[in-house]
A protein has these predicted regions:
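A detector of single, family-specific signature residues
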Residues: 1-310
């Protein structure tokens, strides 16, 4: 009842509703995400068709949908009941598996029903890919008016063109609707909950908000921590990982990215890595204890021995 009472006095803040053009862009980007999920599901069905027919292409190929593996799949569909005895045409220079291992991986037999199912799946995947390409062209044309903001966002760590478009489509370009970056991070579901009762903390998990932007930011965070050109991000991730584990550390990096994006859009400034590298270095005036100095030297591979007794 108290919520209704404060709403009656116009004390409830309104929900974030982006402009119409941002909503249209958001609808297109989310549909692209759905097409990607459909393609992934079809890839899993292809893998299932091969596995139940005793074809173990994933044992010798890092990508079952690569050039060589796709050629073998096409060869299987030409005559599903015929054994493959020569794989020399399918082997590449970069392939680590031996000829015998490849022959063992293709030592299967596919029934007519599985072969027809596999043809339908591959045809559906081709149509999905064509639809996705057409949709991406439409997305790029729709997002062209936000090119300055997209270029700003892409200066941040681990964010490329479609990731930047996805972020803009979710949060918009006007950051005045969020009082602080903490409000934006809470809206995106990147802040821990504070569920406490009678002095007992029930849970500190992140919320379920941000069903679309949160996975996108996590993907960008994973790219950023692996890239060598962003040491400030990787150093922060490694420090958090030691104390809190990978999952909590990567969520913290995703929140860091969203905070960076908020400040870039609000101040109209590109990403400045120096603002985040300061925390990687200890203060110049800091004094190390003897134990700390010995520990640092030992970590660098030096052998520290005590001086001889006088």
């Amino acid at each position: 009842m108290w919520i209704a009472d404060i709403f009656k006095h116009d004390l409830v803040a309104g929900s974030f509703i982006p402009p119409a053009d941002i909503r249209q862009l958001r609808d297109l980007v989310r549909y692209r995400w759905k097409l990607t999920n459909l393609t992934t599901g079809e890839k899993n069905r292809v893998q299932n068709c091969l596995t139940v027919s005793n074809f173990k292409l994933d044992d010798v190929f890092s990508n079952v949908f690569g050039k060589a593996a796709s050629a073998i799949t096409a060869r299987i569909l030409e005559n599903p009941t015929e054994k493959i005895t020569d794989v020399s045409d399918f082997r590449t220079k970069s392939m680590k598996a031996t000829k015998e291992q490849v022959l063992a991986a293709v030592d299967g037999e596919m029934c007519a029903e599985q072969a027809e199912k596999l043809r339908i799946i591959r045809s559906h995947m081709d149509r999905l890919q064509l639809c996705k390409l057409n949709l991406e062209s439409l997305i790029l044309a729709t997002a062209e008016k936000y090119l300055p903001q997209l270029n700003l966002v892409m200066t941040a760590q681990g964010i490329q063109s479609f990731a930047a478009i996805g972020i803009i489509s979710e949060i918009g370009v006007d950051m005045s609707v969020f009082p602080t970056s903490k409000h934006l991070c809470s809206w995106a579901g990147l802040t821990p909950q504070n569920n406490e009762s009678a002095g007992k903390k029930k849970t500190t998990r992140i919320s379920r908000a941000g069903a679309y932007i949160k996975p996108l930011l996590v993907q960008c965070a994973l790219c950023a921590v692996r890239a060598k050109q962003f040491p400030e991000v990787r150093n922060r991730y490694m420090a958090l990982k030691k104390r809190r584990g990978h999952k909590k550390a990567i969520i913290a990096i995703a929140r860091m990215l969203l905070t960076v994006i908020y400040n870039m859009l609000k101040k109209n400034e590109p990403y400045n890595p120096e603002l985040y590298r300061k925390g990687d270095r200890p203060p110049a005036h800091r004094e190390f204890s003897v134990d700390e100095a010995i520990f640092i030297l030992q970590r660098q591979g030096y052998l520290v021995t005590a001086p001889p007794a006088s």
